[in-house]
A protein has these predicted regions:
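Hydrophobic alpha-helical bundle signature of multipass membrane enzymes
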Residues: 1-75, 91-98, 102, 110
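Membrane-embedded catalytic cores of phosphoryl/pyrophosphoryl-handling enzymes
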Residues: 65-164
Length: 164
């Protein structure tokens, strides 16, 4: 089927190899800029969500749907592509926000959200995940990312408070 190829190409934005490569590049840039707090947050966010995914998949052990359009191994719940892309692309957008003009902030944020939601949807379309796997992945990604961002905001407030 002709529609499968573009959907498979799009879902690769959530492939672990691509996400690790992008994560390393972003980390290298943050370290080069000597932005230690955001570098630490980036590692905790991206590596942490991977650890959560692995732990939950192993604990739940839900088999994948039968008859997927592409071969996929491992357990199904939660969707690692969904959780990983949510954290990766939205954290990247959050890191970019201070450097963008206000009009571009919405564009970048919405583009990141569109990629995360699109990758998750592609997993259901390709029949390698149930919708509940994807929803759980998105919620896991959102919760983990929110926790990391709150920790960074708290740390920045504490540091700013000491300077006064």
């Amino acid at each position: 089927d002709a529609w499968v190829r573009p959907v498979v190409a799009f879902t690769q934005l959530g492939h672990v190899g691509w996400m690790v490569s992008l994560s390393v590049a972003v980390l290298a840039l943050l370290l080069w800029r000597r932005d230690w707090l955001h570098a630490a947050a980036w590692v905790v966010a991206t590596a942490g969500v991977g650890l959560w995914i692995r732990a939950i998949k192993t604990s739940v052990g839900r088999p994948r749907p039968v008859g997927g359009w592409v071969p996929e191994g491992g357990f199904s719940f939660p969707s690692g592509h969904s959780a990983g892309t949510f954290v990766l692309y939205l954290m990247l957008a959050w890191l970019l926000l201070p450097y963008l003009r206000p009009a571009w902030r919405w564009c970048v944020g919405l583009a990141a959200l569109a990629v995360a939601l699109g990758v998750g949807a592609s997993r259901v379309v390709l029949r390698v995940h149930y919708a509940s796997d994807v929803l759980a992945g998105w919620l896991l990604g959102l919760a983990w990312m929110a926790l990391v961002i709150c920790a960074v905001e708290w740390a920045q407030t504490r540091v700013a408070g000491r300077r006064c």
